[in-house]
């Protein structure tokens, strides 16, 4: 068993740097890593237009009810309260990123988006980079998994932005099982960029999206979610990729209508938290266990420290198999 020394005194901002030496050579695919769902949604611009991915019914709802509709949408679209710096300082190392252009934007600016628009992408990436510069042994996963209204030019712009901001901090795509903290530290790499677009095949530092699978339960029922999470882990491929367990409940339209004024956090997340956290506590990382675990409102229920502490109690033999 890995040593439990220090696990009760976690330095969350530097938790990777302070892992026991025995874990430095373990593939990152076999560690437990906390992440956030819709990581950028702590800021949603109610003055912005509705995102282009939203169905016509939502577009019409907003066109009729305007700002009131957007305020209600925000209660259900905002899945985080901490900004990137806050999440990083609290221990989050995986970021779920969705990128969009704005209709008729002459500047062709790129924004984070989930229903409504969030901050400019370059601002968020710079914020993450500032943390990495101050914490040179911490490693982040940037998962660009949805693109809305983006043409070839926009992808080229985003790729150049990543180069300009992160430069040599980015780890080129290799076999996932070769990536350990030791490997990354030796080469001064701190950023793994996953890109769910064919563009990834053309750029050495973009990891193909299929190397970061994230099965989605799409349910409001905590019991069904836990069954789904357990089944997904059981089916996890033995080698070859990272793996995300989304400990996330997804509201149905009827759920939103019933709790329209209270929002996602109060209506769903907080009520289901005990059951979801109990599942997390019983997991272990390793080839046939969890890897990256994501959640809404990551500050709730000691989620982050609970995931990190799993690294101190798992069977080292299995992790190195």
UniProtKB/Swiss-Prot annotation:
GO BP term (any one): lipid catabolic process
Keywords associated with the record: Cytoplasm, Hydrolase, Lipid degradation, Lipid metabolism, Transducer
Cited InterPro entries: PI-PLC_domain, PLC-like_Pdiesterase_TIM-brl, PLCXD1/2/3, PLipase_C_PInositol-sp_X_dom
Domain PI-PLC X-box residue range list: 22-197
Chief place of localization: cytoplasm
PROSITE patterns the record matches: PIPLC_X_DOMAIN
Any single Gene Ontology cellular-component annotation: synapse
Gene Ontology MF annotations: phosphoric diester hydrolase activity
Compartments it resides in: Cytoplasm
Xref: Pfam families: PI-PLC-X
Protein name per its UniProtKB record: PI-PLC X domain-containing protein 3
Species of provenance: Homo sapiens
């Amino acid at each position: 068993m890995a040593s439990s020394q220090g696990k009760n005194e976690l330095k969350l901002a530097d938790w990777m740097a302070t892992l026991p030496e025995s874990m430095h050579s373990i593939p990152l695919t076999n560690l437990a890593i906390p992440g956030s769902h819709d990581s950028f949604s702590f800021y949603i611009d109610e003055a912005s237009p509705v995102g282009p991915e939203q169905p016509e019914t939502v577009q019409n709802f907003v066109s009729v009810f305007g700002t009131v509709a957007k305020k209600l949408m925000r209660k259900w679209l905002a899945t985080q309260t901490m900004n990137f710096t806050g999440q990083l300082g609290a221990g989050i190392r995986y970021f779920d990123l969705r990128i969009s252009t704005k209709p008729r934007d002459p500047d062709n600016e790129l924004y984070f988006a989930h229903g409504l628009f969030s901050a400019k992408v370059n601002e968020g990436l710079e914020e993450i980079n500032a943390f990495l510069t101050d914490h040179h042994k911490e490693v982040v996963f940037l998962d660009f998994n949805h693109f809305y209204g983006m043409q070839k030019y926009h992808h080229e712009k985003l790729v150049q932005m990543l180069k300009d901001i992160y430069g040599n901090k980015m780890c080129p795509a290799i076999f996932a099982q070769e990536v350990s903290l030791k490997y990354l530290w030796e080469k001064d790499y701190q950023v793994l960029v996953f890109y769910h677009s064919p563009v990834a095949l053309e750029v050495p530092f973009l990891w193909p999206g299929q190397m970061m699978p994230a099965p989605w339960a799409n349910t409001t029922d905590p019991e069904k979610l836990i069954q789904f999470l357990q089944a997904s882990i059981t089916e996890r491929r033995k080698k070859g990729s990272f793996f995300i367990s989304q400990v996330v409940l997804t509201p149905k339209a009827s759920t939103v209508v019933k709790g329209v004024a209270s929002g996602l956090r109060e209506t769903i997340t907080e009520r289901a938290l005990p059951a979801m956290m109990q599942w997390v506590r019983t997991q272990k990382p390793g080839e046939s266990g969890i890897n990256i675990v994501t959640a809404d409102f990551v500050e709730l229920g000691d989620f982050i420290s609970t995931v990190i502490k799993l690294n101190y109690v798992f069977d080292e033999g299995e992790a190195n198999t």
